[in-house]
């Protein structure tokens, strides 16, 4: 029995150095009391009885006195505070004191007016500043004091968090490692909110006549600010110090732009705030303005501070909340100004839209738009007064792909560093944004040369096609503001960064061969280009660099006929060659088929008949395939011939009907047309506006010209012949 008592006493002493819950501590206190009672009653009786028995039998040997048992720690006589029978009042407020080894958690409890804690800024009374408010410290032994939540915490307290409409809610705020954990209750095992402190800026807003709380505003890029209320200036400084120490202990590289500055731990002076806000444009509600590392209050909050309040009564709390809700509801009814309106409805290729943006390892949907070579991210389409971030695009690099989970993702890099990670909703949207960003960054990269690792071939082809068309359109709009822009059917024309717009078409083979510059009436050569000063003005106005690859370009408006005709003639010649090759191949296949049929008749009933029949089937399949190719080729050739005739008649784009200067209205062969073009005065690469021939779209030529009376070749005739040929082969 004595051995059990000794071991039990040692066990209770060991428990004094451990973290225990309230239930275990109560059981330990009960066991300690029982042990003390047993030692005081039975222990001494057994000792006296043994001493009397020994004195009667033998002389008593010298005995060592028992060591005194140190009295273990006992709770005070007052005992733990009783648990409340009803729910805690609304103004009940607890602050957890930082723990030290071997101590139970202590909480500072204050009761405030529950009406003032409702839904406004008015809660803390003025007694606190004057030193009238008293804090009562007690040890919290009820079940709410969960030791697992505050274990290894640098600081913890019950703080008030400001909600969206100005209301306040009590949270248990704990800083562990480099994170701020907020629990709705100390009984919860999972935090309601987890905020990494790396990259955050924190501001202490002191209490004044309007603000009844000492506030800490924690702002992180891309998220709403977190506003916490503390009890005093000393507590605010303590939290600022702990947050700074927690951030300085972060492992890994730290971005100097996002690191909390030393001045963040110093309270901001009210006079300095007013001075800064008067010189700066105020930001949106809830967003702070960061200057020199110190986050200042927004303009609307400061304006509220300056306005003298008509009444300080507590009954105005509900009115203030009602006004806030009315303002928020009326935000959508306000007409945006011309600066805020996006031009997506007026542009053929909108440079704005919703994208998913990766920020702090979380995807958020943001309204993105491109303006003045900057990518501007807004929180919502309706809120264009303020922006979350503005990224200059000049000098950036566009790289598609991130991982297999997000195949429609593309990134912006500057000097190898990741600037933004964006995700589109579809392949067309991704191609459109890649084309826009390539044009705005001034990149010379072909969208087809980029690596699309996480999408299939069909989707990547769609992305590339859309990106090329968007890139071409953006560069056309940047170079020329002419309303008569050509269509985008030709796709991506110049990946070198210079747009192929209405008046710029490269010469055939990049240069004019075997042609001399035209001479004027006085024998002097005509200038082929405008003066260099005018050219520089055009280039500076367009904002596009001229490279050597497209240096030899001439004005399309004056030589539209030649440019279209040469392109169509080369295509017609290519189609005629393919048609001739198909004819020869078909003739060869028919001859082989005829020989095979004769061989099958000769070898009827022999073993070789099966092999010959298989070969005949293959030949017939190839014949059908070649026939289909020939029909499609005939149709394409007919379209090219019609387009060539329209080009010689003045071009379909401007709606002109100018006949070629040949003196005949009959259909011409490609060779004769080519000779006509060579001898015509419009075939020169003259780009002078004053000394060259009149352009084809001038009013003088339009008045003199007459509509062409020649009839185009009948397209239906070719289709009829093709059908007859198919019916003939089918029978």
Swiss-Prot record:
MF-aspect GO terms: actin binding; SH2 domain binding; SH3 domain binding
Motif position, SH2-binding 2: 452-457
Expression by tissue: Widely expressed with highest levels in brain.
PTM entry text: Phosphorylated on tyrosine residues.
Region (Interaction with F-actin): 595-638
Localization per record: Cytoplasm, Cytoskeleton, Stress fiber
GO CC terms of this entry: actin filament; cytosol; stress fiber
Residues in coiled coil: 558-649
Any matching Pfam family: PH
Residue spans of biased composition, Pro residues class: 59-84
InterPro entries given in the database record: AFAP (IPR030113), PH-like_dom_sf (IPR011993), PH_domain (IPR001849)
Classification via Gene3D superfamilies: Pleckstrin-homology domain (PH domain)/Phosphotyrosine-binding domain (PTB)
Keyword DNA damage: no
Modified positions (Phosphothreonine) in chain numbering: 676
Compositionally biased residues, Basic and acidic residues: 271-284, 721-731
Function: Can cross-link actin filaments into both network and bundle structures. May modulate changes in actin filament integrity and induce lamellipodia formation. May function as an adapter molecule that links other proteins, such as SRC and PKC to the actin cytoskeleton.
Protein name, per record: Actin filament-associated protein 1
Species this chain originates from: Rattus norvegicus (Rat)
Biological classification of the source: Eukaryota, Metazoa, Chordata, Craniata, Vertebrata
């Amino acid at each position: 029995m004595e051995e059990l008592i000794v071991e039990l006493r040692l066990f209770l002493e060991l428990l004094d150095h451990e973290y225990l819950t309230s239930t275990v501590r109560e059981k330990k206190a009960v066991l300690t009391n029982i042990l003390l009672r047993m030692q005081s009653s039975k222990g001494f009786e057994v000792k006296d009885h043994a001493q009397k028995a020994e004195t009667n039998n033998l002389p008593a040997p010298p005995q060592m006195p028992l060591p005194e048992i140190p009295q273990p720690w006992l709770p005070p006589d007052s005992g733990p505070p009783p648990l409340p029978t009803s729910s805690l009042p609304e103004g009940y407020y607890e602050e957890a004191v930082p723990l030290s080894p071997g101590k139970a958690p202590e909480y500072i409890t204050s009761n405030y007016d529950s009406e003032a804690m409702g839904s406004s800024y008015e809660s803390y009374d003025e007694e606190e500043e004057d030193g009238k408010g008293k804090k009562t410290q007690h040890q919290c032994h009820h079940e709410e004091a969960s030791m697992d939540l505050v274990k290894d915490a640098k600081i913890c307290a019950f703080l008030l968090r400001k909600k969206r409409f100005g209301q306040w809610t009590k949270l248990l705020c704990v800083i562990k490692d480099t994170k701020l954990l907020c629990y709705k209750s100390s009984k919860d095992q999972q935090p309601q909110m987890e905020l990494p402190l790396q990259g955050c800026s924190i501001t202490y807003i002191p209490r004044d006549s309007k603000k009844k709380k000492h506030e800490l505003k924690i702002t992180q890029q891309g998220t709403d600010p977190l506003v916490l209320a503390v009890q005093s200036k000393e507590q605010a400084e303590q939290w600022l110090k702990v947050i700074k120490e927690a951030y300085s202990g972060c492992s890994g590289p730290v971005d100097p732009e996002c690191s909390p500055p030393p001045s963040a731990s110093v309270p901001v002076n009210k006079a300095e705030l007013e001075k800064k806000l008067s010189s700066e444009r105020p930001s949106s509600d809830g967003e702070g303005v960061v200057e020199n590392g110190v986050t200042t209050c927004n303009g609307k909050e400061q304006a509220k501070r300056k306005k003298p309040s008509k009444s300080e009564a507590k009954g105005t709390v509900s009115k203030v909340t009602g006004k806030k809700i009315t303002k928020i509801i009326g935000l959508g009814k306000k007409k945006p100004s011309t600066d805020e309106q996006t031009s997506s409805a007026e542009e053929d290729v909108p440079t704005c839209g919703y994208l998913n943006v990766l920020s702090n390892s979380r995807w958020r949907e943001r309204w993105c738009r491109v303006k003045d070579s900057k990518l501007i991210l807004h929180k919502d389409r309706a809120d264009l007064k303020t922006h979350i971030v503005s990224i200059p695009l000049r000098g950036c690099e566009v790289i598609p792909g991130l991982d297999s989970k997000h195949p429609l993702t593309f990134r912006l890099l500057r000097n190898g560093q990741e600037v933004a990670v964006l995700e589109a909703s579809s392949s067309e949207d991704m191609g459109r944004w890649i084309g826009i960003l390539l044009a705005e960054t001034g990149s010379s990269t072909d969208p087809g040369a980029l690596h699309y690792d996480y999408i299939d071939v069909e989707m990547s082809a769609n992305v590339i096609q859309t990106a090329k068309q968007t890139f071409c359109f953006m560069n056309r709009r940047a170079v020329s503001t002419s309303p008569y822009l050509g269509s985008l059917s030709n796709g991506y024309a110049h990946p070198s960064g210079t747009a192929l717009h209405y008046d710029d078409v490269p010469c055939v083979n990049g240069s004019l061969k075997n042609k001399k510059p035209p001479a004027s009436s006085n024998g002097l050569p005509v200038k082929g280009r405008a003066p260099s000063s005018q050219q520089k003005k055009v280039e500076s106005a367009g904002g596009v660099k001229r490279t050597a690859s497209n240096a030899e370009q001439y004005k399309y408006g004056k030589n539209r006929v030649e440019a279209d005709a040469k392109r169509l003639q080369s295509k017609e010649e290519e189609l005629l060659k393919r048609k001739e090759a198909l004819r020869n191949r078909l003739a060869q296949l028919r001859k082989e088929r005829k020989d095979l049929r004769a061989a099958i008749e000769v070898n009827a009933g022999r073993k070789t008949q099966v092999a010959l029949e298989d070969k005949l089937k293959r030949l017939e399949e190839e014949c059908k395939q070649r026939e289909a190719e020939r029909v499609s080729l005939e149709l394409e050739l007919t379209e090219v011939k019609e387009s060539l005739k329209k080009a010689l008649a003045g071009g379909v784009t401007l709606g002109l009907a100018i006949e070629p200067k040949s003196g005949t209205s009959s259909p011409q062969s490609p060779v004769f047309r080519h000779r006509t073009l060579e001898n015509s005065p419009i075939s020169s690469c003259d780009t002078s506006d004053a000394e060259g021939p009149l352009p084809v779209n001038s009013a003088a030529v339009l008045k003199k010209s007459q509509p062409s009376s020649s009839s185009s070749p009948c397209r239906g005739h070719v289709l009829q012949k093709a059908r007859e040929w198919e019916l003939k082969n089918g029978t």
